[in-house]
């Protein structure tokens, strides 16, 4: 397994191995995705972030569903963050579904996923970081499942992608409050 990013470990949580044999900073693979544990909140629940895709699948994976939870050694971990550069350069990726516990989409998270067409943003997403979808000019549909969205960096999408949204080549669906804020942050009328 290759760690694609160094995590910032929160002050909360345990820094030692718990009874499940998991610890903050530990990386693990579930399916085609690589995760890193960011906190251990209780005896049975913690948090993790997606930090990448298994190297052998990076240029082959067409569909990614980031689930609400990814278990490691029987320990339940809520997936709350998509790490910086996690899926950058996944050239075959066409469809992305972000789970309902994810709150942050990191910098460059889906940069240069040149075939990406469909994005479903989960209920809890609050932040879409800088260049999160830069270079993804073929997006045809973005669906917002919730109304928690607060921050969309103005350079989260490329100029071409913004132009497609403005001209309605890219359809925006779902929660009206999230769509309104999304368009406002990207300065799209």
Stretches found by the model and what they are:
Residues 1-12, 32, 39-44, 58-81, ...:
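Structural signature of tandem-repeat unit edges
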Residues 12-19:
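Extracellular interaction modules
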Residues 19-20, 30, 88-92, 111-112, ...:
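Glycine/tyrosine- and acidic-biased, solvent-exposed loop/turn segments at the edges of beta-strands
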Residues 83-86, 106-109, 129-132, 155-156:
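Consensus positions within tandem repeat domains that build extended binding/scaffold surfaces
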Residues 21-57:
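Short beta-strand/loop segment at the start of cytosolic alpha/beta domains
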């Amino acid at each position: 397994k290759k760690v694609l990013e160094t995590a910032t470990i929160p002050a909360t949580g345990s820094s030692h191995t718990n009874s499940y044999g998991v610890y903050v900073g530990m990386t693990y693979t579930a399916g085609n995705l690589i995760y890193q544990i960011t906190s251990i909140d209780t005896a049975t629940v913690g948090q993790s972030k997606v930090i990448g895709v298994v190297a052998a699948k990076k240029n082959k994976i067409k569909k990614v569903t980031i689930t609400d939870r990814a278990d490691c050694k029987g320990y339940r971990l809520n997936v709350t963050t998509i790490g910086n550069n996690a899926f950058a350069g996944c050239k075959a990726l066409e469809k992305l579904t972000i789970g309902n516990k994810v709150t942050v989409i990191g910098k460059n998270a889906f940069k240069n996923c040149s075939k990406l067409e469909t994005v479903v943003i989960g209920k809890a997403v609050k932040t879409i970081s800088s260049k999160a979808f830069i270079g993804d000019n073929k997006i045809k549909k973005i669906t917002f499942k919730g109304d928690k969205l607060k921050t969309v960096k103005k350079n989260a999408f490329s100029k071409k992608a913004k132009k497609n949204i403005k001209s309605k080549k890219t359809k925006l669906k779902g929660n009206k409050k999230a769509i309104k804020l999304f368009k406002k942050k990207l300065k799209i009328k």
